[in-house]
Structure formats: structure tokens, C-alpha cells
Design a protein with these regions (language model features):
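Charged, low-complexity intrinsically disordered terminal segments
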Residues: 2-5, 25-174, 178-508
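N-terminal Sec-pathway targeting helices
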Residues: 5-12
Length: 508
């Protein structure tokens, strides 16, 4: 390789120094924008029929990706007045583009759309986001954005190194409200793998479709984030290269899913909403949501605590049983104490999380691995999802054989009557760093249904049960019993061992 002349090498060095100096010094400042509120509930349109069926709070579990996709699309297609969508991740894949296509159609009908998305996974998507937000009826905001934009996640991270503390705080909330009548709340992001459509690996997740008086609280939650000073209009962050926005752009990428989920007539929509409200579970509901930081997201005093406090209180008040499903399970010291106290009171604690092979974040599994013995010793029952679960076909579109299953759901069932479902995992990142949202429902019938839906996930053909035998961990399932983690390879175990020895637990 030829050497650069001294002058050229000097310019390269100076350029790199300037690059890193710029990355370390610049800071994005929050905005002051006029406050906006949710559009009042529509009195017309297919969604309004739910008010004639159920005036009290009602809930329906969205157990499978197909159910979740069908009801989301139906809500978007049924809206006539407003649509508010808050999410952590929205990928440019089949499902992601299907949502964009249907949202554009809604906007063309005159629906006022507000989209609020966290900036964690938006690298390379500024132009498609700008084209979506260019529609006169669509407002698109990015929460806690990276000030220096890039199409590469790596270069974007380097460019913004000086703001690591601020950018470490993320909005993990997931919520959709349509026409002020219904909402969807839970764990799903907007991408193929959350709806069973990824060709390689998909998630088992859980959400609630809800209606009733709680909708006004959910709208207020959305407004609080929408009006936060760290919610930036996308046009403040990047410049649109082409003004044309076309449904065809997104429809072409979503063709396969579009034929699977065709649009319905207004009469079909109204009938579907009437029936789901009639068949729903009824129960008192209370929203728990982390407040957006008052000043800068990195401020210790502003760290979210509302959802964490409620989760810990729920377990702390349990009298007989706690069933906790969490994609990532890394108990904080406070949560560990709460679980220990529950077991000491005679409460049965049953936990379901990812195994080494089903986890999409190996570092999270590695840190959790350090806590397994402690959880077992305090008396908890610990289960891990099998990536090759026999019943994974329930959550995955065909063909299933070559597809892996992972867990992404986040919910608790306490004493067979209280249900807490939302976006929060039982880990330090959800409990102490990110903002989260969750709905607490007091309903024995809903709890019974969720327990029935979850039983299949705990079954030995679908999950490993962990034991501590003479100081060694043992994984047991329907067809085998092993003393090493069920990794896909020895190298995966080596990677996990490496991560387990890094000082990263507080960030997981």
C-alpha cells in the first residue's frame, strides 16, 4: 500500500481530530413548540359503534401476530378523524411498509395522523420518514433524536459521542389510538418479526386492544410525549430530497401482506368492532406511564420510575401467585428483594424469559445468566423459551419449519385477577433508563384468559425449566435434560461468557 505524502497524511489526521472534536462538543438543544392535544373522539365512523356496546373499560388480548396485524390495520382503515401512533422501532420491511401504505390512505381520507417514534433505529430512514411526514395530514416527530444524522448506525453513534448520556435514554413506549375510541398497547414494534412474517426468526408477543374511559388517559399520555421539548419534527432534523409522496412507494414493498389483509367495507368494519366490544373482557383499568424528563434526559433526577414502582408494588402486594413474562430478565437489587419477600410470604413466582438461542440480544442473556442461580435459590420457578418450540406455529406465518422463535412479550398476572401489560421488561434499562408504558387491569376473567394463553409457552415441549442441582444449572425440557445452556453452538456460549464478564449490567 503506497504511503500518503506528508501533507495528505497531515490533512487526514487533522480531519479525524476535527471529526472527533465535533462529535464530542456539539449538543442538540430542546425545542419549544406550540402545545397540541388529541382530536376529540369522533361521533361518526365505524369505530364509534364500540361506545354503543360497552361504556366501561374493555380489553381483548392480541395473542398472535396475525391478530395484532389484523386489528391494527382495521383500526387504521376504520379511522375517520384521528390516528396517534407512538413506537420504539419501525422498520422498512413488508409489515413496516404495509402500515405506511394504510396510514397514507387514511391521511388521504382526511384523517389527522400523528406519528411519534424513538430515534434508536432510524438510521438510514430519514428520507422515507420525511416523505411520510410531507403529507399535509401527517405530522411526524422523532423523540430524543441524534443531532448529527447518518445512514449508518455506527457512524451516527460516533458522530454523537459527545451526547452519549442523553442518547442512552430512549422512549420504549408503544401505543396506538384511533378516533378516540380504541387503543392498542403492549410490546410489539412495527416490523416483520413482531407479526410472525420474518423468514428466519420471529417473536411471541402480547398486547391488549382496549376501549372505554381509559382512552382519554392514553391520549393524554401520547400528548405529554408529543409536546415534550425533545420531540422533534422530522423536518427539523433532515432535508427532504424529493417532495413526491406516493402510496405506491410503500404498497410495492408490502404487496405480499396486502393480499393477506385486504381492506374492508365500512359495514364489515363496523360489524367487526361491534363484535369485538361485545366479546371483550371487562375490568377496571389504570394507566401507568413514565413521565418524559423535565429537562435533559440524562439528568439523574429525571430518570423514569413510575412504571418500575408499579411493577415492584404489584409483586410486593401479591398474596398467592405471580406469573411474569419478560423478554429480558435482569432483576435490579430492588426487584430481587421484592421477589425474595414474595417467596418468603408463600407466593408462587413463575418466570418466563428467553433462552440463549431465542434471545435477540446475547449480551442481555449473558447478564441474566449471572442471576439464574440467585432466582432459583430464592424460590422462583424459571423457564426459558425454546427457539425450536413445538408450538411456534401459533405465532409464525407459514412456512414454519426453518424459523426460530423468540420472546418479546412483557406482562404480569398477579393473584389470578390483576394483569399488567405494556412495554417494560424486567431489566435495568426498562426500570431505570428508558421510558415505558403499561396498563393495569383488575379482571379475573382477563387474567384467566391470559393464563390459559400462556400455559402453552410454559409447556415442556416449548420451554426449558431450570434447576439448581448440587450447585450446577440444569435445563430440562420434554425430550432432553442438559447441563449446558441450549446454545446453537459452542461459539455462542463463548460469546455469552465474554459478555457476562463485562461491566454492562446497568445498561442492559
Amino acid at each position: 500500500m503506497p504511503k500518503l505524502p506528508f501533507g495528505s497524511r497531515s490533512k487526514v489526521v487533522l480531519g479525524l481530530l476535527a471529526f472527533f472534536f465535533q462529535a464530542a462538543c456539539g449538543q442538540l438543544e430542546p425545542l419549544n413548540l406550540p402545545s397540541e392535544s388529541a382530536v376529540p373522539a369522533e361521533e361518526a365512523g365505524p369505530l364509534s359503534v364500540v361506545e354503543t356496546v360497552a361504556r366501561q373499560n374493555w380489553q381483548i388480548p392480541l395473542n398472535t401476530g396475525r391478530d395484532a396485524l389484523e386489528w391494527r390495520l382495521r383500526a387504521i382503515d376504520s379511522a375517520v378523524g384521528s390516528l396517534d401512533l407512538q413506537t420504539f422501532l419501525w422498520l422498512d420491511d413488508t409489515v413496516g411498509n404495509l402500515f405506511k401504505e394504510r396510514i397514507l390512505k387514511a391521511a388521504d381520507r382526511g384523517v389527522k395522523v400523528r406519528i411519534l417514534i424513538d430515534d434508536s433505529f432510524l438510521a438510514g430512514q430519514d428520507q422515507s420518514s420525511l416523505r411520510l411526514g410531507a403529507h399535509p395530514n401527517i405530522s411526524y416527530r422523532v423523540y430524543n433524536p441524534y443531532g448529527r444524522r447518518s445512514n449508518s448506525t455506527v457512524s451516527r453513534t460516533v458522530l454523537n459521542l459527545g451526547e452519549f448520556s442523553r442518547l442512552d435514554h430512549r422512549m420504549h413506549n408503544k401505543l396506538m389510538v384511533a378516533d378516540g375510541h380504541i387503543a392498542i398497547i403492549g410490546g410489539r414494534n412495527l416490523a416483520d418479526e413482531y407479526f410472525g412474517m420474518d423468514p428466519q426468526s420471529n417473536f411471541r408477543d402480547m398486547e391488549l386492544l382496549v376501549g372505554g374511559p381509559i382512552i382519554s388517559d392514553l391520549e393524554a399520555s401520547f400528548d405529554s410525549y408529543w409536546n415534550d421539548r425533545w420531540a422533534f419534527p422530522i423536518e427539523k432534523l433532515a432535508r427532504l430530497q424529493t417532495q413526491n409522496v406516493s402510496i405506491n412507494e410503500f404498497a410495492a414493498k408490502a404487496k405480499t401482506a396486502s393480499t393477506e389483509f385486504p381492506s374492508e367495507t365500512a359495514a364489515q368494519q363496523q360489524s367487526a368492532w361491534r363484535n369485538v366490544a361485545k366479546e371483550s373482557y371487562r375490568g377496571r383499568a389504570r394507566l401507568h406511564v413514565d413521565a418524559p424528563p423535565k429537562d435533559r434526559p440524562e439528568a439523574i433526577a429525571d430518570r423514569p420510575a413510575q412504571v418500575a414502582n408499579e411493577l415492584e408494588r404489584l409483586i410486593g402486594d401479591a398474596r398467592s401467585e405471580v406469573i411474569a413474562v419478560s423478554a429480558y430478565l435482569i432483576p435490579t437489587p430492588t426487584l430481587t428483594d421484592v421477589l425474595r419477600d414474595a417467596e418468603a410470604r408463600g407466593v408462587d413466582v413463575k418466570l418466563l424469559t428467553n433462552s440463549i438461542n431465542s434471545n435477540n440480544h446475547l449480551s442481555a442473556y449473558a447478564v441474566y445468566r449471572n442471576h439464574i442461580a440467585e432466582l432459583l435459590n430464592l424460590g422462583a420457578e424459571v423457564h426459558e423459551v425454546r427457539a425450536d418450540a413445538k408450538d411456534r406455529y401459533r405465532y409464525i406465518f407459514a412456512p414454519v419449519v426453518e424459523k426460530k422463535l423468540g420472546l418479546h412479550a412483557k406482562y404480569l398476572v398477579v393473584d389470578r385477577r390483576k394483569v399488567f401489560i405494556g412495554s417494560a421488561n424486567l431489566d435495568p434499562r426498562s426500570l431505570r433508563i428508558n421510558t415505558e408504558i403499561g396498563l393495569l387491569v383488575d379482571s379475573p376473567s382477563l387474567a384467566k384468559e391470559l393464563i390459559a394463553l400462556t400455559e402453552v409457552d410454559f409447556a415442556p415441549e416449548n420451554a426449558w425449566r431450570l434447576e439448581n442441582v448440587d450447585g450446577s444449572l440444569v435445563w430440562s425440557s420434554a425430550d432432553t435434560r442438559r447441563q449446558t445452556s441450549p446454545a446453537e453452538s459452542g461459539f455462542q456460549r463463548l460469546e455469552a461468557w465474554f459478555f457476562a464478564h463485562l461491566p454492562i449490567e446497568a445498561e442492559m
